[in-house]
UniProtKB/Swiss-Prot annotation:
Protein family: Belongs to the GTP cyclohydrolase I family.
Gene Ontology CC, one term: cytoplasm
Annotated catalysed reactions: GTP + H2O = 7,8-dihydroneopterin 3'-triphosphate + formate + H(+)
Molecular function per GO: GTP binding; GTP cyclohydrolase I activity; zinc ion binding
InterPro entries: GTP-CH-I_C/QueF, GTP-CH-I_N, GTP_CycHdrlase_I, GTP_CycHdrlase_I_CS, GTP_CycHdrlase_I_dom
EC number: 3.5.4.16
Binding residue positions for Zn(2+): 75, 78, 146
Species the sequence originates in: Alkalilimnicola ehrlichii (strain ATCC BAA-1101 / DSM 17681 / MLHE-1)
Protein name as annotated: GTP cyclohydrolase 1
Gene: folE
Class of this enzyme: hydrolase
This protein's UniProt keywords: GTP-binding, Hydrolase, Metal-binding, Nucleotide-binding, One-carbon metabolism, Zinc
Pathway linked to the protein: Cofactor biosynthesis; 7,8-dihydroneopterin triphosphate biosynthesis; 7,8-dihydroneopterin triphosphate from GTP: step 1/1
Record text on subunit structure and interactions: Toroid-shaped homodecamer, composed of two pentamers of five dimers.
Keyword ATP-binding listed: no
Length: 185
């Protein structure tokens, strides 16, 4: 597969009128193929692999929040990056997951061709599946280069998405507590 991706980048350079054998571009197809494999490595990962057994029994039933998880993904429409932060919360019901595993779940889904709306939902559903918690909340704010570098070229635009499951959806007080806590410095 790697050779095919590299050949495709070589062809793109040629179709742009470039010489892929010139000094500055000689290794570009291989580097671009390697970068694309890294940026989409989420396709090679699954939830069990990412968790690596880090699900623990716990009596805690209070909100757990992991804030400011940096993320980057590729827009599935233009293959251009979107870059932002995710805030993920859940209400445990007998189980908690390792702190780094929340960030790894975000990365697993972000490192695929995506739209932000689906990414937000996929993260929420995965955390719900793993924790079996009473609720999950995910809020993502991101800047999309497909909107900044092309099309309408709006440099300061940002997109926000949220998914609320369980108590976060059904209980406005719980939802508002989450939204307030993610804005607190």
């Amino acid at each position: 597969m790697s050779e095919r991706i590299e050949a495709a980048y070589r062809r793109i350079l040629q179709d742009l009128g470039e010489d892929p054998d010139r000094e500055g571009l000689k290794d570009t197809p291989a580097r671009a193929a390697k970068a694309m494999r890294f940026l989409t490595k989420g396709y090679q990962e699954d939830l069990d692999q990412v968790l690596n057994g880090a699900v623990f029994s716990s009596d805690n039933d209070e909100m757990v929040i992991v804030r400011n998880i940096e993320l980057y993904s590729l827009c599935e429409h233009h293959l251009l990056p979107f870059i932002g932060r995710a805030h993920v919360a859940y209400l445990p019901d007998g189980k908690v997951i390792g702190l780094s595993k929340v960030a790894r779940i975000v990365d697993m889904y972000a490192r695929r061709l995506q739209i932000q709306e689906n990414l937000t939902r996929q993260i929420a559903l995965a955390v719900q599946q793993v924790t079996g918690g009473k609720g999950v909340a995910v809020y993502i704010n991101a800047r999309h280069l497909c909107m900044m570098m092309r099309g309408v070229e709006k440099q300061n635009s940002e997109m926000s998405t949220s998914v609320m499951l369980g108590d976060f959806r059904e209980n406005p007080k719980t939802r508002n507590e989450f939204l307030q806590l993610i804005r607190t410095p």
